[in-house]
Amino acid sequence: MKLLLTIAMILSLLSPFGTKSSGKNPKPDGASTSYEFTYSGTMMYPITFYEVKRDSAGAVRIAYIEHNGTDVVVIPGPEDIFDHIDRAVAQYKLYKLKNSYWPRMEILDGNGWHTRIRFQHNSIYSGGSNARPPQKIYAGIDAINSYIQSVIDASSEADVLLRQDYQEYDR
């Protein structure tokens, strides 16, 4: 048991040196217009899914998957949510995210994530398979997701506009 703990500690200390990355993103041009984050394992449904965008009438909508669920739930979002996203992008310099992250060693199973932030004139895209960017940058994604989750937590069943299986949801 001690040996396993020691190996786990060594691997966690070496993980910053074990990530490869490629691609780059532009600095944001204009205000954000949509946000998407997905964290998935090897299952059919994502572990975490958030999407923030405006509907055809211009109203802000938040789509998410409930914990361990299979349905996408859509609720109204606050009008200032894009201000929060823009501040996090600037504060954490999310435009420094690389397009792709992966481990130096081959891993045949595991978890993947991706995020896309669209702005008026361009977008930031990043994703990874069993690897993440440096924590000081990834903290910006965590900050956005935490804010979205706080809005979701403050909502009620009466706020639900749509509930649909993830496989059928039109993204």
Please annotate each region the language model reported.
Residues 78-105:
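Charged, amphipathic alpha-helical segments
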